[in-house]
Amino acid sequence: MGKKIISAIAAVGLLAAGVYLGSQFGSDNSATIVGGADRYAQKSGATSAAVGSLAKSVGASGKGQVHAVRDGESIQAAVQKAQPGDVIQVYPGTYKETVYIDKDDILLSGVIVDGQWPTMEGGQKLNDAVLYSGNSITVENLHITHYKGNAIMGQAGNNFLIRNNRVIDTGVYGIFPQLGKNGLVSNNVLSGIEDAAIYIGMCDNVHVNNNEVFANVAGIEIENSRHSIVENNKVYNNTGGILAFITPGLPIKTTFDVIIRNNFITDNNHPNFGAPGSIVSGVPAGTGIIVMAADEVTIENNIISGNKNVGIVITDHDSFANITKDPDSDPHSDKVSILNNLMFNNGAEPIDDIKALKIASLTSGPVDIISVGTSRDSCLLNPGQYPSLGTKSFGTCGFSTTADTVTYLLPEPVAPREFKLEEKGKMVYYGVCAGCHAYNMRMIGPPVETIQALYMDNPQGIVDYISNPTKKRDDYPAMPKQDYLSPEIRRAAAEFMLNTDSKGVFHDPALNQQK
């Protein structure tokens, strides 16, 4: 998550100084009717299939050989023996390892016996628990704890199913599918994550439901992703609850067609425990939902309460300084629709910038919704239902529910892909490197521009470093080893990184579908 999230909240202070307060923060809403009932049924594979069939096109087949792994044995050794279609059953015990799945159609399933779970234990030494780059992967029934980086990370794998896992204290991210299409994240419990518990990064057609996320810095994030539904989750006691946004400088340039519905988003007031010096360490506590530069986000039928800063913030890239703009990303949050939600007891203890904004706009009492900056063609179903600031330009929504759009999961799995070596290097860059490195702004790792300046025509230098990295700067976390990738793949990814830019091949038309 980038500087945008921090700045978006703090940016309201700029408006408090008097930036078009009269036009932007009046109490009357436009009478314009915005949007129709089919607004979100676009070229996205939306379906009205029964909820019970959500997993039809995702996850492994489980039709092959069963490999049993017991306490004292290696999960990775079983993965290496497995063939597509096989099942790896992990019995209760403690497994201190990183598992990398680079094959298609593998079912990694914990076996729970008399309440005893198989535990993957990082010991605060290992970076990642489970990494997968294969397609049609299932990861389920694992207790994962004490890793430094990620519990479960997808690296350009499609048709993923991540369910029924307990993820506790796993460093930066909990569940992090990156650059995947057609995936379900369901029935997981996540707590104690320094950044985002569930982080959907540069994905399409993802369903996030029935998860419980609490005591994290960020609960659920939809970043540079399209056609996603976040529903029926319990999101509480995080620093911030649910976020939909665009990070500038990534290969995918858009976030749109996101439905946030039927969630409990309550009491997200946890003190921020992000790593000192990290970006998220500056996120203020107390915000239920943040929409930043994302389009076509619908917020419906949620219970949003007890968030001491504000219930919902809608903002854009233009509302604050000190962020590098991406010319290929629209900076505005357009076509945001706030339908019927139950909102109460939000905004009781806002940050100082929001207090200043309320004073400047002659507003008293708590505020549920704040819109900062430009938001075109956005709407409220019932204008005046919620105490709000900055929503005068919002129209009245022309539809009242998204119930007919049950899921954006595809009816059939995405077909397997075959890549040449140079294409594999690009996909590794997109699916692995871009999880921590944007082109020209800081994320978990330094900008790509900085890496290019350091290594220039020396791709082997990058290969050597990522194979056995050492911590060089106090203001960035240590980089994990990438030695699970073959030397040829590491070299191809390094060459791609050194030859990419913010436009050109970095702005990949194949990834940036039109709305």
Where are these regions (language model features)?
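Short glycine/acidic-rich loop motifs that flank beta-strands on beta-rich extracellular proteins
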Residues: 95-101, 117-119, 124-128, 148-154, ...
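Right-handed parallel beta-helix
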Residues: 109-111, 135-146, 159-172, 181-196, ...
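Right-handed parallel beta-helix/beta-spiral solenoid domain characteristic of secreted/periplasmic
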Residues: 69-73, 105-148
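Acidic Gly/Asp/Thr-rich repetitive segments characteristic of extracellular carbohydrate-active
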Residues: 61-89, 94
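Axial heme c-ligation environment in periplasmic c-type cytochrome domains
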Residues: 443-452, 468-514
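Short, T/G/N/S-enriched strand-turn elements that build extracellular solenoid repeat scaffolds
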Residues: 57-58, 75-82, 96-103, 155, ...
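Electrostatic cytochrome c docking/interface patches
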Residues: 68, 410-428, 514-515
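Sequence/structural segment immediately N-terminal to covalent heme-attachment motifs in c-type
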Residues: 420-439, 461
